[in-house]
Amino acid sequence: MPGLNLTRDEAIERASIIKRVHSYHIFLDLRTDQDVFASNVEIRFDAQEGASTFIDAITSSVKSINLNGEELSTDLADGERIQLPNLAAENVLKIEAEMFYTNTGEGLHRFVDPADGEIYLYSQFEVPDSRRVFPVFEQPDLKATFEFEVRVPSHWVVVSNQPEVKVEPKDCGCGRANTWYFKPTPRMSSYITAIVAGPYEKITSELTNSEGRVIPLGVYARKSLMPFVDAEDMFELTRQGFEFYEEQFKTPYPFEKYDQLFVPEFNAGAMENAGCVTYLETYVFRSKVAEALRERRAITVLHELAHMWFGDLVTMKWWNDLWLNESFAEFMSTLAAAENTRYAKEAWATFSASEKTWAYRQDQLSSTHPIVAEIRDLADVQVNFDGITYAKGASVLRQMVAWVGQENFMAALKVYFDKHSWGNTVLDDLLVELERTSGRDVRAWSAKWLETAGVNTLAVEVENDEAGNISSLGIRQSYAEGFETLRPHRAVIGLYNLVDGKLTRTDRIELDIDGELTVVEEAIGKKRPDLLLLNDEDLAYAKIRLDERSIETAIKHLGDIDSSVARGVVWGSLWDTVRDAQMPARKYVDLVLNNIGKETNSTALRTQINNLSATLHSFVAPEAREETRHRAADR
C-alpha cells in the first residue's frame, strides 16, 4: 500500500518542511486487550509555517488529533498516515490512538508462554515499524528525544532505552497496575527506540567505563528460560567490548545503561536498540553446543554493541547507507573478538569460513549488486538486505582498513564521532575523514569497490632460477565477464617452508596490488618456498589462485600450518579453484581427506565437510564418483 511504502523523495520533502523535531512524549497502556493497545503521543516540532505534511501511524483507530490546540477531524487518518495541514512555525501535536499487537516480530510483538501462560511483549522497529506503536515521523534523519510512560500489570517489568525514573502503582478498576516512567532519551532515530514488557526475569551487573562512569548492565529472559541463560558470559563479552571500543574509538559509550534481552519468536538475530538490545532466544543454549555457536553469539553481542556508536550515536541519513551500518558492526565485532576476547586465535578464521564464504557465493550469482545500492523506498531496503550488505560489505571494509591502515581508520572514526554525534551522515562524511588521516584517494577506492559488483581473481605467477631462488613473482588480477573492474588490494604474501614437521611462515611481504599485473620486486632472490601463500592473513577480498607447487604442498601438509587464518585462505582458494574447474576435483578430495582431521576451527570444519560433500556429488567425474566416495568413506 502506498502509505506504508515511504519513498526517499517523500522523506526528503518532509525533512524540508519539518525543520526540527524536539520531543515525543509517549503513553502506552498495555493492560487491557489481546489485540490492541492505547497509544497517546505529544510531539513538539518546528516546521515551515503554512505548509502541510503527514505523520506515520499504522493504527486500529484514531480517537483524536489536536494540532496547536485545534481539534482536527479523524478523517485525516487513513490507518497508515495522518495528514497535518497548515502547520505553524512551532507545533504541538497530540494524538490518541489504538494500535495493533503483532505476532510477526514487527511493531509490538505479543507472545503467550506455553509453559506458564504469561504474556511477553517486545518491540522491533527497524526498518519502519515504530509507527506501529506510536505516531511518528518515521525516517532516520528526523531525530528527537523520546520519553516513554508505560502502564502494565503490576507483576510486569518494563525495559526501555533509558533508566526508569519511577514506578507508580495504581488501581485502575481492572486490577492492580504500575505505570513506568522513563527518562527522556538523547536525540536519536525512532527505529532504535524500544519497549520490552512482561514478567521477564533479570540478572544485573555493572562496569566502569573509560570516563569513570558506572554503567548498569542487565540480562533479561522469560522466567521459563532464565535457568539456561549464561549471564556471566554475556557480561564478560560486554565488558571486553566496552573496553575495546572505547579505546579504539576514543569516544565514551554514549548511553546511560546497557540491557540485553532474550525475546521469544524474534525474526532477526538481534537488534541494536539504544541501551536495550534484543536477541533471539536461540542464543540461550539449553544443552552443550558446538563452539562455533558460542563464537557466533559472541560476535553478535559485539556486533550490537558496536552499533551503539556507529548507527545509534551517529546514524545514516537514509537507508541507502544501511550496508555501512551493518558492515561496520560486523567488521568491528570480529576485530574486537580477535583483539580482546578468548576467541582471539579463531575470530578471523571463522569470519573467513562463514562471512567471506557467504560473500563470495552471493557475489558470483546473477543476483549480485553493488554494495552501495539505490534505495528508492522502504520496499527496496528488504530487497538489498542480504549477503552483499552484510558479508561482502564487512569483507571489503576489512580490505579498506588494511589499505588505509588501522591506526588511520580509528583516527578518522574519532573525528567522525566528534563531528556528528547525535546527528545523521552520508557515506562521504566518513570518506572525507579517511582521506584526511590516510592521505589516500579513498573516494576513488570507494567508486571501484562500493559502486560495482563482482569479485576479482588474484593469481600467482612465479619462476625460480637453477639455485631454487625466486627470479620473478607477479600477481595477475582478472575479473569475471560482465564485471570489468580491476581494483586496488592490500595483501600479504606468506612464504611457508617445512621445518621440523611444521609448515612454518619464514618470510612475509605486505604490498599494494593494483592493475592487471603487480610485480613483487621484494621477493626476487629469496628461496622459493614450499608454499607461497597469496592473501596470507586474509586481508583482501578476492579469489586466490596458488601456483602448482604450493597446491601440492597444501594437499599434503595444510594441517601442519598452525595459523587457522592461513589454513582458511588455502581452504577457500582451492575450493574456488576446483569450483571454477581450474583444478581436478580429486585433488580437492585429497586435500580434505589428508588435512580435515587436523582442522581446529569448528566453522571451517563444517564448511569443508559441506564442500567435500558437494565435490563428491557434483564435481568428481561420473566414472570416478563411486570409487572416490568409497575412498572418502573409508577415511
Question: Where is each model-derived feature located?
Answer:
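N-terminal, polar/Ser/Thr-rich
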Residues: 1-38, 114-120, 140, 442-447
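Aromatic/His-enriched, Gly/Pro-containing loop or helix-boundary segments
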Residues: 71-87, 123-131, 281-300
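Non-catalytic accessory/interaction domains
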Residues: 2, 149-152, 168, 223, ...
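Ligand-binding face of N-terminal immunoglobulin V-set domains in extracellular IgSF glycoproteins
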Residues: 38-55
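A surface-exposed beta-strand-loop module
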Residues: 57-114, 135-138, 175, 179, ...
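Extended, low-hydrophobicity, Ser/Thr/Pro/Gly-biased non-transmembrane segments
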Residues: 3, 15, 98-206, 232, ...
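Solvent-exposed beta-hairpin/edge-strand motifs
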Residues: 50-71, 490, 494-499
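Hydrophobic alpha-helical and helix-loop surface patches within well-folded domains
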Residues: 182, 211-214, 218-482, 621-634
